[in-house]
UniProtKB/Swiss-Prot annotation:
Pfam families the UniProt entry points to: DUF34_NIF3
Binding residues for a divalent metal cation 2: H65, H221, E224
Residues at which a divalent metal cation 1 binds: D103, E224
Gene Ontology terms for molecular function: metal ion binding
Family note: Belongs to the GTP cyclohydrolase I type 2/NIF3 family.
UniProt keyword annotation of Metal-binding present: yes
Gene Ontology cellular-component terms listed: cytoplasm
Keyword field contains Cell wall biogenesis/degradation: no
Name of the protein in question: GTP cyclohydrolase 1 type 2 homolog
Superkingdom of the source species: Bacteria
Keyword set, alphabetical order: Metal-binding
Subunit (UniProt): Homohexamer.
Origin species: Lactococcus lactis subsp. lactis (strain IL1403) (Streptococcus lactis)
Amino acid sequence: MKISDFMLEYEKFCPKELAVEGDPVGLQVGNPNDELTKVLVTLDIREQTVAEAKALGVNLIIAKHPLIFRPLSALTSMNDQEKLVLDLARAGIAVYTSHTNIDVVTGGLNDYFSQLLGMTDIEVLDDEEGLGRVGNIELTELSVLTEKVKASFGLDRLRLITYDHNLTQKIGRIAICGGSGGKLWPKALEKKADIYITGDIYYHVGHDMLSAGLLGIDPGHYIEHAFIRLVADKLRSFDMGVKIYESQEKTNPFYDI
């Protein structure tokens, strides 16, 4: 089986056309005509995941976050990104990126997050780009919801966006968007969410949300590591006789102390 055959099968589930405009998805490094040996699924491509791929003998990495987000003007090993690209090319390891298309697609990452939180009557948060989800839950105290979010995403801590620290208030409708979805908070308000869950919420955005009457939970960007299990399981379901590995390397740059 060639890498191109594998890509074709994956794109039946998660078409590249679903990606947000300008988002680099698809094959970024490597020859699609190479024979496929083994696959590693990871959130990020960093030095440790490249080393992991080499040790496992894979020749295709499927990553959530693009290795090349902006066009490269040179390949000189003068910065970390160029070094990674050259290292992968020399090792014969191809890179395929599935970024916002896995967020948008039905059965993708945002649907998975919604299921983890027990949301019902789920709809799309941003109707224009397809990002995020909104849904209902049984009326739940904020304190209980925060614990559920931590348990669902394997977190020790999270940031709660509220002024009064009232953890007894009831939540019945949730908006959620994996990654960095701060700009979509007005959409959550429009769809009558009581609380918006997303990563990388800026200080002033938090003020704006609260002034508009919208609570928030920032669980961090790294909850997207759920991509690894979700996509690996999907690839295994294709039953194409290719070994699929889930990356064991931690690529979260933040460490809570």
